Amino acid sequence: MTDTRKPPRKKPQRPAKPAAPREKATLHPRNRHQGQYDFAKLIKSSPELAAFVILNPYGKESIDFANPQAVRVFNRALLKAFYGIAHWDIPADYLCPPIPGRADYLHFLADLLAEDNEGVIPRGASIKALDIGTGANCIYPLLGHSDYGWQFVGSDIDSTAIAAATTIVKANGLSKAISVRQQANRRQILLGLLDSSERFHVSLCNPPFHASLEEAQRGSQRKWRALGKADPKRKLPVLNFGGQSQELWCDGGEIGFITQLIQESALLPSQVAWFSTLVSKASNLPPIHSALKKAGALEVKVVEMGQGQKQSRFVAWTFLDKAQRAPG
């Protein structure tokens, strides 16, 4: 008997489906820096920026982010155009921060405070924020006051940074909204910094990432390579992207600094409703959680953020219940 069954159809061979490109992490919805920058508009308000504008490999206007002077002028233009900060400058070799990422931290902190305020973001001078390690750039107080009207105290151990930040604050007429003070004891973070009567709704911190100068230099070299600008002749690269030693490294590195911050926060549990810090390395989260448990934190939150291909996060913790934390 003849087999009339049709042979099984072969599945047509299709080319392998290309892997989808990783989605770029998006900025917080309230972040002012969505999409491409309008360089014509930036140059109109800050003509000095024109000298630093280049075309990137995609034919788009940009700047050379390996050039500290270009980054400084670019930041000055952004602060003027987006935040009304007319006067901003920092000493040579001090940290020049990426503004969109710094703004994101503040927006997510505002969301955190809203959770204790019936979903409404608290705004105005009644909200007090403490910026630990404000730096010469004073960036968090400037952005936070512009976006939300909060009052800020910025602290630092570096007298030059304090002087530069104070100059920025005074030049922009913000002395009633932002104050800066020096932590006199370089071995302490919070202790000895605050008056016993002071109360803050939130604290924020961008801690030193590295545990030594050599580690910081290797990190700088990786950034050079990412920009295709590594100098193979240098055994130890110059610290690029700005940053004094105390801004980039400390004994114990990021985890050492954050652990000390947690320990000191437990000694001042009612003076800050929500303590927080950026955490650059996700691998540091387990020991941070352990330190917070040991310190007796009542509630802990990890908030993931992303700018472009970069992922970042901050940890927030409190020793107070919701009723005690409510802005008022």
Swiss-Prot record:
Q: Which UniProt keywords apply?
A: Cytoplasm, Methyltransferase, rRNA processing, S-adenosyl-L-methionine, Transferase
UniProt-annotated location(s): Cytoplasm
SUPFAM superfamilies registered for this protein in UniProt: S-adenosyl-L-methionine-dependent methyltransferases
Gene Ontology BP annotations: rRNA base methylation
Task: Give the residue ranges for region: Disordered.
Answer: 1-31
The catalytic activity, as recorded, is: adenosine(1618) in 23S rRNA + S-adenosyl-L-methionine = N(6)-methyladenosine(1618) in 23S rRNA + S-adenosyl-L-homocysteine + H(+)
Q: Which Pfam families match?
A: Methyltransf_10 (PF05971)
Q: Does the keyword rRNA processing apply?
A: yes
Please state which protein family the record places this protein in: Belongs to the methyltransferase superfamily. METTL16/RlmF family.
Which NCBIfam families does the entry mention?
Answer: PRK11727.1
- Function in brief: Specifically methylates the adenine in position 1618 of 23S rRNA.
According to UniProt, the name of this protein is Ribosomal RNA large subunit methyltransferase F
What lineage is on file? Bacteria, Pseudomonadati, Pseudomonadota, Gammaproteobacteria, Pseudomonadales
